[in-house]
Amino acid sequence: MTQQTSQKHNPVLVVDFGAQYAQLIARRVREANIYSEVVPHTATVEEIKAKNPAALILSGGPSSVYADGAPSLDPQVLELGIPVFGICYGFQAMTHALGGTVANTGNREYGRTEMTVDGGILHADLEETHKVWMSHGDAVSVAPEGFVVTAHSEGAPVAAFECAEKRMAGVQYHPEVLHSPHGQEVMVRFLTEIAGLEQNWTAANIAEELIDAVCAQVGPEGRAICGLSGGVDSAVAAALVQRAIGDRLTCVFVDHGLLRAGEREQVQTDFVAATGAKLVTVDEREAFLNKLAGVTEPEAKRKAIGAEFIRSFERAVAGILDDAPEGSTVDFLVQGTLYPDVVESGGGSGTANIKSHHNVGGLPDDVEFQLVEPLRLLFKDEVRAVGRELGLPEEIVNRQPFPGPGLGIRIIGEVTEERLETLRAADLIARTELTAAGLDSEIWQCPVVLLADVRSVGVQGDGRTYGHPIVLRPVSSEDAMTADWTRLPYDVLEKISTRITNEVSDVNRVVLDCTSKPPGTIEWE
């Protein structure tokens, strides 16, 4: 699928110099309806050429170009004839490689900064003086030969430059963040007016191309199974593959006992009604609980759940083949892996492995299926757009994300049936009250976490109790790469807390997780 997409859309490559916003830059490019991918700064010139990029964007980073071991830009990259846009550290690395001057001016700029426009294409028709988001110590003091300085600030004599002839430009500030109000306009101007790219990355053609890619991978006679988790990702992946190969796809819903209240029934009704897909439900609750017995380490949990998913599918294949023509096999496994999953699992050289995603790093080495991952290069909002393009109802498309490992990674400690019942009850109360308050559209998701290995002292019924705390983790996000905690109304929080402590046994405390991502991931495990 990756090759198929790359052939039709030469990517804008975001070269990651260690920036926390590299994925956000890629998102902003896609918001401009242009396809993008992230590559590490360690990518060689030959590796970059092999991707046939439409343009390069050099990300920010925490280093100084003069520091020992600082990531550098191979000057040959700038000789490929590819449009290049530098941001913050990428702007300085670009300047350094082209023979300009980067200096420590002693005037650092962090946060909102007033910048003055001196002309050029990038900032045409914008206010002469406006706010941008800066985060730098060093600054470009002399632009490379042939480049026109188009903006400055108090701490950055060269806050932006461009060379239309070479199709290169750069800015010292961060146009990708919302704190730079005109940042997206500036990025679009580079992409369209300086780089000359077409804006043709849309939900309609994404869906069409992904369907074609699945057809090419599975072939005219291949059969596939798809594991449904109850979430939007697996639902859209299944709908795409069904559109490609029809009844040669069988969807398998594994009831692993790690589901929320009503999850199984909802999948069996909503998804089948929306797609008409063949659905087989298998009860594997006992197998999963046995596999998780005694497991407390988060990474071990994810890998155990991922491995048992595969074993469950293998056990389901025999039943599926009973209805297939004699001699048929099932060779393909469809998964709803997304681009953030790949990135967080260390998707590429030089990329940190934050945690194994059950679809990426949590699979056993002896998988008997070929993986079909039609959403592997998409962000969550793109998945929703493709789902709508395929005609899936809003009840499925707008569903809040729910991880494949389910409640198993929302119990801090060993997973037991008793603890699952406790968490399931608390989760249902939280979801019910958020829906009743009309807040579903305002939050990305609200994981409810049981601190099963923690005992909290409480007073209930005039007596001392030692119960478990429940954590509410409401977050707002665009794509799960970054997230902020959602400021829920106090009265809603109070109602959720009161109901949980009154109605859920062995829980005597409810706490709010107000950590953004970064530093914390959305899920606790």
Curated annotation (Swiss-Prot):
It is an enzyme of class 6 (ligase). ATP binds at residues 229-235. PROSITE patterns: GATASE_TYPE_1 (PS51273), GMPS_ATP_PPASE (PS51553). Its EC number is 6.3.5.2. Residues 11-200 form the Glutamine amidotransferase type-1 domain. One of its GO terms (cellular component) is cytosol. One of its GO terms (molecular function) is GMP synthase activity. The active site is at 88 (nucleophile), 174, 176. Residues 201-399 form the GMPS ATP-PPase domain. Pathway: Purine metabolism; GMP biosynthesis; GMP from XMP (L-Gln route): step 1/1. Keywords: ATP-binding, Glutamine amidotransferase, GMP biosynthesis, Ligase, Nucleotide-binding, Purine biosynthesis. NCBIfam families: guaA_Cterm (TIGR00884), guaA_Nterm (TIGR00888), PRK00074.1 (NF000848). Homodimer. HAMAP family: GMP_synthase. Catalyzes the synthesis of GMP from XMP. This is GMP synthase [glutamine-hydrolyzing].
